[in-house]
Amino acid sequence: MCGGRGGIWLALAAALLHVSLQGEFQRRLYKELVKNYNPLERPVANDSQPLTVYFSLSLLQIMDVDEKNQVLTTNIWLQMSWTDHYLQWNMSEYPGVKNVRFPDGQIWKPDILLYNSADERFDATFHTNVLVNASGHCQYLPPGIFKSSCYIDVRWFPFDVQQCKLKFGSWSYGGWSLDLQMQEADISSYIPNGEWDLMGIPGKRNEKFYECCKEPYPDVTYTVTMRRRTLYYGLNLLIPCVLISALALLVFLLPADSGEKISLGITVLLSLTVFMLLVAEIMPATSDSVPLIAQYFASTMIIVGLSVVVTVIVLRYHHHDPDGGKMPKWTRIILLNWCAWFLRMKRPGEDKVRPACQHKPRRCSLASVELSAGAGPPTSNGNLLYIGFRGLEGMHCAPTPDSGVVCGRLACSPTHDEHLMHGAHPSDGDPDLAKILEEVRYIANRFRCQDESEVICSEWKFAACVVDRLCLMAFSVFTIICTIGILMSAPNFVEAVSKDFA
């Protein structure tokens, strides 16, 4: 019984002694390692030999890509390892002490910085402890939020792929003193970004020579390759622009008498201008290249602007004053003949009026009125017009090929009317009939002028309809060509649509 209790107490005492000895070993080791240690001294056994530093990084997150300021913000953990000749110990002399940690500034560490840093402090890393094991192997893992300058190529925006470089190197050591070796980047803990897809982060070791020195200056450059996800921009910019450009085609379908053709065209043009300003706020103020979406907006604005100009011409044709003159011959041939035939358009009422005129090509002329004073004394019922109508009973219509005939209405050609006005006179003994004939001539002349004005107006209105239909087809083709040709010219258009819109 006593022997069992004695064994327990001995085991407990041995454990406490081991813990106290381990703490004592670690304390003594720290004192031995930092004794006569100079953090400014390069820890190598031979000063003529370079110190090899292995460098890598772990990309955790792409936080922001500022296209306007051309700055990439990333969350990165750096990984640096080297061997310190002065921080080695024999584990048998310090049992239980496998590794020790030194704070920043107490031991030597490489001054590796991000060359293309855009941070106000330049060095954005959090200085952590350096982990050292018994063989002198040192491991330094400082995390940081890095802001690096990156040239943003907006040529294919929003179907663009960006490549941002992260260039790391020693700030004061050359290649003969510090040999910087690259290791592959780690993206196993990467957090996906809602705007960018990470395609890869390949690295490359470079050596650069300066005129001042013969030794090389090595650096490690990692290229962050990322593809923009286009779903957001497609729903908020591209699709509204396509719909607005389609609305611009409705200008040619809107009747000219509605009075809203110009208003609709200008409204569409202003809408595209607003979207253009939204794109300009995102893009950097650079003249190196024009973004793809800006090209599409500009081409659409040009098409809409031309549609407004054509609408003005259409309205001018539609509301043309008949007293302003007849349609020029070349305009009639091009618009009313060629374009109307190509568009399969016919004048309103053309199929109804022309056959009737062809079957009854008759014209009534005042010259055919036979006035016979010798037929007997004129009888009167007390109405002056009755005498006139009695005199017009002999009026008849004769067939004539003249195009001035108006079917269903009494019409007289200008030559016949002038002949009647100057050469045809009734009998000298019937002044009432002469007055009636003069009134008939006036009425016929008014009808003829109205018919001519209606023909001129109908020609101009039909020409306006032809221009509207022709521009509707032409602008539809141009809009489709611009939409497909410009947007599909992006190298990764198919990949972006298949991945983001699927």
Curated annotation (Swiss-Prot):
TM ranges: 234-254, 262-282, 295-315, 470-490
Protein's cellular compartments: Postsynaptic cell membrane; Cell membrane
Entry PTM: Glycosylations at Asn-46, Asn-90 and Asn-133 are essential for TMEM35A/NACHO-mediated proper subunit assembly and trafficking to the cell membrane.
Outcome after substituting N445A: Slightly impairs dependency on RIC3 for functional expression
Tissue specificity statement from the Swiss-Prot or TrEMBL entry: Expressed in neurons. Expressed in umbrella cells of urothelium (at protein level).
Effect of S81T: 10-fold more potently inhibited by the alpha-conotoxin RgIA
Protein name: Neuronal acetylcholine receptor subunit alpha-7
Organism expressing this protein natively: Rattus norvegicus (Rat)
